[in-house]
Regions:
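Structured-RNA-binding interfaces characteristic of tRNA pseudouridine synthases
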Residues: 1-159
Length: 159
């Protein structure tokens, strides 16, 4: 059985996070349903981590196993025809049997955006925190210094 890696990006506004839930629409389940239509059998998607409800992912890695003969380079096109516009498979490739998106993840990067203006911009809705008051850049710079360097976030990670 092949082990296939998918490089995804998605807008999480309409989803209750990555992880499959019994009664909620999730990114993983939406992707599984699309993959099942393409490969012709049930699949289980493993993701590189959980995202919360409403969270977006610009570069997200998932993997699944299949014995379908669809070439990996054709999978993005095939999957994207069965996915909503807010989930896109950017690329796919075959990998070794031992790869698992969550267990093989070596790095995560989070971006938090502040839209600082007196007037809201609809293009930033669900993509940035709207803050209409004056920002104290000195305080922000001082806070940002705490993140410079290498840190052990083991106490707050989920993997």
């Amino acid at each position: 059985m092949r082990n296939v890696i998918l490089h995804l990006c998605y807008l999480g506004t309409a989803y209750h996070g990555w992880q499959v839930q019994k009664t909620e629409v999730t990114v993983a389940r939406t992707l599984e349903l699309a993959a099942e239509q393409v490969v012709g059998h049930p699949v289980h998607m493993s993701g590189c981590g959980r995202t919360d409800a409403g969270v977006h992912a610009r570069h997200y890695i998932a993997n699944f196993r299949t014995d379908a003969r669809v070439p990996a380079e054709r999978l993005p096109y095939a999957l994207n025809t069965h996915l909503p516009e807010d989930i896109v498979v950017m690329e796919a490739w075959d990998t070794h049997e031992g790869f698992n998106a969550i267990g093989s993840c070596v790095r995560k990067e989070y971006t938090y955006q502040i839209y600082n203006s007196k007037i809201r911009d609809p293009f930033y809705v669900n993509r940035a925190w709207f803050y209409p008051r004056q920002l104290d850049e000195t305080v922000l710079a001082r806070a940002a210094e705490q993140f410079v360097g290498t840190h052990d976030f083991a106490a707050v990670r989920s993997v």
